């Protein structure tokens, strides 16, 4: 045990402890120590290797590390591979920027696929190293050496194997469907990639007329639709109405007496006409006819952009195209009650089109540009205004404006998405959705309401589009026959199978990515060649494989614990569950925890453009890793969003400084007295020692309970409360005088033994969240025979030391002291001035008998009287309860009560209800008030009250001044950076003390008074006593 000198530097401590761990291979030794104990399988939700870590990922990894350190200290064999997301758009978009590429086409024409893919790999690996070091800087212990990397062949092979399983179970299919499409990244996206990626946009809002084709039956009649995507009108093939809604044929008369008939849902006629009047000279309108929507089915109309697109003329010749169709999806929430339907550009449109055997027409390319018609080569959104202008010229616009609404964006490049029909590969989730829901109920969710959110999300999920038209990802292991009439395909499940099936001589090296696998050719049963589909897998498929691909397993090993952020509930939690259901028919995790988002102090999302981003490296540099870790877990409940606050970081710093000061106080006195821990000293414990020993074991027990859940906020709050309130502000104050006793006094040694025991237990339970300071303290306190590292110890509750009776007794004494201190504050009677006496009720007599010395010393009280306080008692009838009990007899009862002796009545009612003049009086019928003299302050306790005599005497003033002087001299010693044992010489002017008082001061401050000395430190103060007197104090101190 070494003396603690100087101020603590948490950042330097981080570096020192990390060196100790690394030089002594502590992580590896802990793994070895626990290898024969039960497994605790953890799956690391992989962060993208696309840049540096941020505060959210720091929080995420701190949660993980805290739980895993706890489990290691419970002797679990923790399987803790780190994981990384290394494929997909997050990497590709960054690499495109590095090459200054403007489009997907540039990848192939300006760089080359092979170079681009190699650069993606290099980019991912480089960022992995950077981020790994940042995590290590936070003190994160994971198996970094054997981390799972989705770019490795074994992981890719696991993906292929799982896809073949899906095929074997008839859960894989290729289909033409409408889905999300990013025109910048030129790829399809899955539904879960878009959740949470909606942004407010300002789009056109246009009401358009479609003329009824049969002018004889419906002269000058138009169906009116509303859309925010005028660019899709070129592909309009149907208009949908609700079969059960009422539709009005509205005769519209313009100022020039021209007439038209507009068909609009009756409930929306007024709103639509109101808008129309803003841009049309409408004189009047009238509903001339009403029909049900189903009566409109089959009526043919003329597409609004017939002349602008030759293909529309072809479609117009088809009987069931450009007709009114029925759809339950049509609502009255807005618009006109008639829905423009382009089966190639909308999910509901697509389903309606299939129902009516309509063509699926989507005349745009991968970049979102038209491939035919008037606007050929134009990006669809760029055509909006010209399309509106064209429709205006054709007198088909009822109203054209703008509307702000939420719209899906690409989760990586943030481009507004398009809905587009393409052929993609799908996992048929609809077939196993019920299993996913049922198995989700068997998992422990933290917090438990996440289960409902997850299940509700699953219920509305569609089939999973897993194919991406990109480059950097797990290649789809699907080889398709080149003979269009054949259409057969093979799905490869392993490298061995690949080698067996390939017919050309392509070396299979250690990289199964494009473009190598694209060159492999197979032979179809029909005799033709088979080539691989060029697509790669959705990157969420990569991370979904983690539970088994990360450990190269082909059997389900359920994770004991996973945790990720709010946005992953319907993303990573879902992707791994869906794949596990497909492969193993079960959920892959036992316990699933969600945490919130990190925001700035005002609740705003952190953004580089706003300039409010907090870099965790900067916080660690200023405060140290442990303080950031503790803050992240204690700032609020994990599932709530965290508003980062430097002020709250400083509060955590105060907690850790308090811990360090408590530790240094203990160690420095132990070193001074050459103390060695010895359990024999437990034979001399006082009750306050037994109390803190019981409290640290109770804390350990409670911490284990909440860490098991895990409720990490409760864990950190409990530890913080123990450090600040139980250890520093109470126990150390209780034993301070015992540390000044003679060297071999058992009373002092038992206090040291208690402090040693408590500090050791405390750092063990603190270690999961604050590993550096815990290791630092442990290394200085450990004695021969103890494990090399604190992380080789076990968190243990010593139940035999938990004594609830002692805890309750000391807590009551502390409550009394706290009440005395609050009473002092109330009247500005500082603790340095003694109180002549306090009065406590009889029911606290046993506490006073046991702990009078604690109450006197900590409250600075000279005498304690145990009796009922005899102030003047007055009574007041409680009219609220009297009215309920006595109704019209209340006046009579009040008269009776007012005639009673208040003290006698109070004593009688203390034993229960009484009867007076035939009326039953209960305790709640009367309120009693004790009138307290001016020199007494009353403070309530759980049991009764404490009455504090604040009368000042000359003796009390002198005692207080003595303490004032001691405090000033101790402060001067601290300023001079003197060690505990160093003695001083003192001069003093301004206050006269007798010889006994001077000796008391000398003993406390380790000094001697001298008439005159040449001082190293001279200071002056004006000291004001509680009665208002002011003393001009001057003190000089010199090192002896």
UniProtKB/Swiss-Prot annotation:
Binding positions for ATP per the UniProt entry: 608
Q: Where is this motif: 'HIGH' region?
A: 47-57
Keyword list (alphabetical) reads:
Aminoacyl-tRNA synthetase, ATP-binding, Cytoplasm, Ligase, Metal-binding, Nucleotide-binding, Protein biosynthesis, Zinc
Needed cofactors, names only, are:
Zn(2+)
Place the motif 'KMSKS' region on the sequence: 605-609
Keyword Ligase found? yes
The record's section on Gene3D superfamilies has:
HUPs (3.40.50.620), Isoleucyl-tRNA Synthetase, Domain 1 (1.10.730.10)
A GO molecular function term, named singly, is: aminoacyl-tRNA deacylase activity
A single GO CC term for this protein reads: cytoplasm
* The reaction(s) this protein catalyses: tRNA(Ile) + L-isoleucine + ATP = L-isoleucyl-tRNA(Ile) + AMP + diphosphate
Q: What is its EC number?
A: 6.1.1.5
- Which domain of life does the UniProt lineage start with? Archaea
Matching Pfam families: Anticodon_1, DUF5915, tRNA-synt_1
Biological process GO terms, please?
isoleucyl-tRNA aminoacylation
Question: Localized where?
Answer: Cytoplasm
Q: Does the keyword Cell inner membrane apply?
A: no
Family, according to the entry, reads as follows:
Belongs to the class-I aminoacyl-tRNA synthetase family. IleS type 2 subfamily.
Summarize the subunit comment.
Monomer.
Describe the task this protein carries out. Answer: Catalyzes the attachment of isoleucine to tRNA(Ile). As IleRS can inadvertently accommodate and process structurally similar amino acids such as valine, to avoid such errors it has two additional distinct tRNA(Ile)-dependent editing activities. One activity is designated as 'pretransfer' editing and involves the hydrolysis of activated Val-AMP. The other activity is designated 'posttransfer' editing and involves deacylation of mischarged Val-tRNA(Ile).
Listed PANTHER family: ISOLEUCINE--TRNA LIGASE, CYTOPLASMIC (PTHR42780:SF1), SOLEUCYL-TRNA SYNTHETASE (PTHR42780)
Q: What is known of its domains?
A: IleRS has two distinct active sites: one for aminoacylation and one for editing. The misactivated valine is translocated from the active site to the editing site, which sterically excludes the correctly activated isoleucine. The single editing site contains two valyl binding pockets, one specific for each substrate (Val-AMP or Val-tRNA(Ile)).
Official protein name in the record: Isoleucine--tRNA ligase
The gene for this chain is ileS
């Amino acid at each position: 045990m070494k003396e603690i000198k100087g101020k603590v530097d948490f950042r330097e401590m981080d570096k020192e402890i990390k060196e100790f761990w690394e030089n002594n291979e502590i992580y590896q030794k802990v793994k070895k120590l626990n290898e024969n104990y039960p497994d605790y399988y953890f799956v690391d939700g992989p962060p993208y290797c696309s840049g540096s870590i941020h505060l959210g990922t720091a929080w995420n990894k701190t949660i993980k590390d805290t739980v895993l350190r706890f489990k290691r200290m419970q002797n679990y064999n923790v399987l803790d591979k780190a994981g990384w997301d290394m494929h997909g758009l997050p990497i590709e978009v960054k690499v495109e920027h590095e090459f200054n590429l403007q489009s997907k086409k540039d990848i192939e024409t300006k760089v080359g696929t092979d170079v681009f893919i190699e650069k993606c790999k290099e980019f991912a690996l480089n960022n992995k190293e950077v981020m790994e070091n940042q995590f290590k800087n936070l003190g994160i212990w994971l198996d970094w050496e054997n981390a799972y990397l989705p770019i490795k062949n074994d992981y890719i092979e696991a993906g292929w194997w799982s896809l073949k399983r899906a095929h074997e179970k008839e859960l894989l299919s290729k289909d033409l469907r409408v889905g999300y499409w990013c025109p910048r990244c030129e790829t399809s996206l899955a539904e879960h990639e878009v959740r949470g990626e909606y942004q407010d946009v300002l789009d056109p809002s246009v009401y358009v007329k479609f003329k009824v084709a049969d002018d004889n039956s419906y002269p000058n009649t138009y169906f009116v639709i509303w859309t925010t995507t005028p660019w899709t009108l070129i592909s309009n093939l149907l208009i949908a109405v609700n079969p059960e809604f009422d539709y009005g044929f509205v005769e519209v008369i313009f100022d020039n007496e021209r007439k038209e008939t507009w068909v609009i849902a009756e409930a929306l006629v007024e709103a639509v006409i109101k808008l129309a009047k803003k841009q049309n000279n409408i004189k009047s309108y009238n509903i001339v006819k009403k029909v049900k929507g189903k009566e409109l089915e089959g009526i043919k109309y003329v597409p609004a952009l017939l002349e602008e697109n030759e293909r529309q003329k072809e479609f117009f010749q088809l009987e069931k195209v450009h007709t009114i169709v029925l759809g339950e999806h049509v609502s009255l929430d807005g618009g006109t009650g008639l829905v423009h339907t382009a089966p190639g550009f909308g999910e509901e449109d697509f389903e309606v089109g299939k129902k009516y055997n309509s063509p699926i027409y989507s005349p745009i390319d991968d970049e979102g540009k038209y491939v035919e018609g008037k606007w050929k080569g134009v990006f669809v959104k760029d055509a909006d205004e010209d399309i509106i202008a064209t429709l205006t010229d054709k007198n088909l616009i009822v109203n054209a404006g703008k509307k702000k609404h939420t719209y899906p964006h690409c989760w990586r490049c943030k481009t507004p998405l398009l809905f587009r029909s393409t052929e993609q590969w799908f996992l048929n989730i609809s077939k196993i959705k019920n299993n996913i829901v049922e198995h989700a109920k068997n998992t422990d969710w933290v917090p438990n309401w996440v289960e409902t959110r997850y299940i509700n999300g699953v219920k509305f999920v569609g089939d999973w589009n897993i194919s991406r038209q990109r480059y950097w990802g797990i290649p789809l292991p699907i080889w398709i026959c080149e003979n269009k009439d054949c259409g057969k395909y093979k799905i490869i499940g392993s490298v061995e199978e690949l080698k067996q099936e390939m017919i050309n001589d392509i070396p299979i090296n250690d990289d199964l990515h494009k473009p190598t696998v694209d060159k492999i050719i197979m032979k179809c049963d029909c005799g033709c060649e088979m080539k691989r589909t060029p697509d790669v897998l959705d990157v969420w498929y990569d991370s979904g494989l983690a539970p088994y691909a990360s450990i190269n397993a082909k059997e389900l090993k359920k994770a004991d614990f996973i945790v990720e952020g709010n946005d992953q509930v319907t993303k990573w939690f879902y992707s791994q569950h869906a794949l596990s259901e497909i492969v193993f028919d079960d959920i892959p995790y036992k316990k699933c925890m969600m945490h919130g988002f990190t925001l700035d102090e005002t609740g705003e999302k952190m953004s580089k453009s706003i300039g409010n981003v907090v870099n965790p490296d900067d916080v660690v540099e200023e405060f140290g890793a442990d303080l950031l870790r503790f803050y992240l877990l204690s700032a609020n409940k994990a599932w709530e969003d965290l508003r980062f606050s430097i002020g709250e970081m400083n509060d955590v710093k105060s907690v850790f400084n308090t811990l360090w000061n408590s530790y240094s106080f203990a160690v420095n006195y132990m070193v001074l007295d050459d103390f060695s821990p010895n359990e024999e000293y437990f034979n001399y414990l006082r009750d306050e020692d037994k109390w803190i020993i019981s409290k640290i074991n109770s804390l350990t027990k409670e911490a284990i309970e909440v860490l098991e859940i895990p409720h990490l906020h409760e864990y950190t709050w409990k530890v913080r409360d123990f450090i600040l309130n139980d250890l520093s502000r109470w126990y150390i104050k209780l034993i301070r005088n015992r540390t000044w006793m003679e060297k071999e006094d058992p009373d002092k040694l038992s206090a040291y033994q208690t402090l040693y025991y408590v500090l050791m237990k405390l750092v063990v339970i603190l270690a999961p969240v604050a590993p550096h300071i815990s290791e630092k303290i442990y290394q200085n306190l450990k004695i021969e025979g103890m494990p090399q590292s604190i992380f080789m110890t076990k968190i243990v509750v010593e139940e035999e030391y938990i004594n609830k009776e002692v805890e309750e007794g000391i807590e009551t004494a502390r409550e009394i002291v706290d009440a005395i201190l609050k009473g002092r504050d109330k009247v500005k009677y500082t603790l340095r001035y003694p109180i002549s006496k306090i009065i406590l009720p009889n029911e606290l007599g046993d506490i006073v008998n046991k702990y009078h010395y604690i109450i006197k010393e900590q409250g600075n009280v000279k005498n304690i009287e145990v009796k009922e306080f005899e102030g003047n008692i007055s009574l007041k009838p409680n009219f609220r309860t009297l009215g309920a009990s006595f109704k019209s007899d209340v006046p009579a009862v009040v008269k009776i009560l007012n005639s009673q002796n208040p003290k006698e009545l109070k004593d009688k009612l203390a034993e229960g209800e009484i009867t007076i003049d035939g009326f039953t009086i209960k305790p709640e019928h009367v309120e009693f008030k004790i009138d307290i003299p001016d020199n007494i302050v009353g403070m309530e306790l759980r049991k009764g009250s404490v009455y504090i005599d604040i009368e000042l005497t000359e003796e009390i003033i002198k005692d207080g001044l003595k303490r004032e002087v001691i405090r000033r001299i101790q402060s001067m010693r601290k300023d001079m950076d003197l060690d505990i044992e160093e003695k001083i010489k003192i001069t003093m002017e301004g206050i006269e003390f007798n010889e006994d008082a001077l000796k008391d001061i000398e003993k406390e401050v380790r000094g001697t008074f001298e008439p005159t000395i040449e001082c190293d430190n001279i200071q002056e103060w004006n000291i004001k006593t509680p009665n208002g007197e002011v003393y001009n104090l001057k003190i000089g101190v010199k090192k002896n």
